[in-house]
Amino acid sequence: MGEFVGIDPLGAEKLIRQMEAGKDVLARARPGLEAAIAEAGAEWAGREGVAPMHRTWWFFHESQQDLKWRIDTIKRIVPTQQTGMLTGTFPFSSATEATEAAKRDAGVITAALNYHDQFLSGPSWAGVEKALAALKSRIDDPSYSAALLTALGPTTFQKLIRDWMNTQAAGARRGLTPDTLKRAGESSPGLLARAFAAAESSGRLGNEWQKMIETAPSDILSSLVALAPQSGTFLNRVATNLLTRPPNSDTFPTDPNWNLHNLAKAYEANPEAFRRLLAEHPNEAGVMLDAYTIRSLGVPAYEETLARALHGALKPGVGADDMRERAWITVINSIGSEHTLWVGGGIGTFADSPISRVLAQDITPILDKLARGQAERNSPEVPYLEPRAPWDKLDPTVSARFLGALMQDSTAADTLMKAGTDYMKQLDMGRFHPFDPSNYGREAHINLAERTGALTNLLLAGSTYAEWSDDEYADRLAGFLLMPVDFINNKYLPMDSALASTGKDKGLDDVKDVMKNLITDYLDKKTPDTARSIASTLVNEQVEWLSRSLRENGQKALTASETAMMRDAMEGRIHDALLDALERRGG
């Protein structure tokens, strides 16, 4: 009964591949050898014909099966990412022994369930629990779990979980609550979910179990993926099915919907699967991100859980870059869509949103993609601005709405401003002077300036959707406008002393105050100036500050024509977005 096993999964898998290559050689050689033996007849010099080849082929085949069983089992017993030798005590000494034990246990469970169906009492259900408890030390063996589930069948499997819910969680009608889920994990549903994970992830279940996804109740499926880590393939199949069911398909559609919360919880534990869902199933993933979904579930914990799942899937550096970028595009299109309720809807604002804060925290690597899309729209004639696929299909208007949705949360807005500033520092626009004598230098400066201006443009456009006070709005607008100016100022006007640097920072603060006051006076209707004239004045303030800083720090002053060119360039990059932001807020 059982044995202590030590195995190196990677080495064993390599051996399996080598034996497969040997089987292939034998399979290709055997027909020709058989034909040669038949043709030679009695003159064949060999003694046993092709029989040794048959035995060798079957030796390889049976050894492969045994090794695969051992690999699958040790990975369940020792769930780790480490490589090298893994050790553990197997509940069975062979897959055959595991299969026979599973069939016997399935018979005991079925008999206990039939007895319970006759009496529907506490003691009769205790008998079912006792029969299932015997599985605890055995279900990490995939052959055992597969044989057990095959013997029970999908219908009995679901009934065991449903009967536990009926007896232990009668009030949970749209998925298990966290407390109930915890109790289920420590009882028979948890054991059944673990058995399913062991059997399904190793590819040992028949098609009828995949078809179960189409017919099983939502709470059964959401519990199954929440109670034990299922394979990413199965988890995503469950998700795409649940997320396409009619919103009111549940028996009790007005109850709090814990099913989606438990699905999000499963994705929190499996970032790779969630990243793939976002990238490959944008419509279904969009249901999870929908503002109405978030607000109507009746489960406040859902947004926080979804935020953690998004962070796991999207944080910089995780997974393959192309998969992560496609996942980001789904998130941006979902939250920033034309009819999104994240902004301007009738369900309130997202002023304190963990989702907004997480997305703002993780957005830095894709800011250049967003900026390039806006820059190409602003200046299609400038070379080398266009974003590469798949970002070339993202509408900059959607990007602006997405940023605006995030900026409803003040903390997220601050994070976005910092990310934007860091992005401009990373571009290092000052590597090239706007009036460089070489064509390459000027073109390079224009390219970088277009991208910094485009990001400012997006932030300004997004600000029209943010629900800020007038004072906060004016302060942030002035901050957005000065982001590229601040960078140029620091690049071209380096300070050797802390005192001089403090003075320069004060000068920048002064011009920000001037710009903020201009915006505040306009919003408070303390000036007869129009939004258009205020926008022009704000651009002039930027250019005049740069020109003044150059003179005060002994740098070569801008000529009149250079000043005009700088003003036209800045105005062209941000004027329309700035004007729209002022008109919408001031109106």
What is each PLM-predicted segment?
Residues 83-587:
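Non-catalytic all-alpha helical scaffold/repeat segments
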Residues 1-114, 118-119, 126:
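N-terminal secretion-targeting helices of virulence/extracellular proteins
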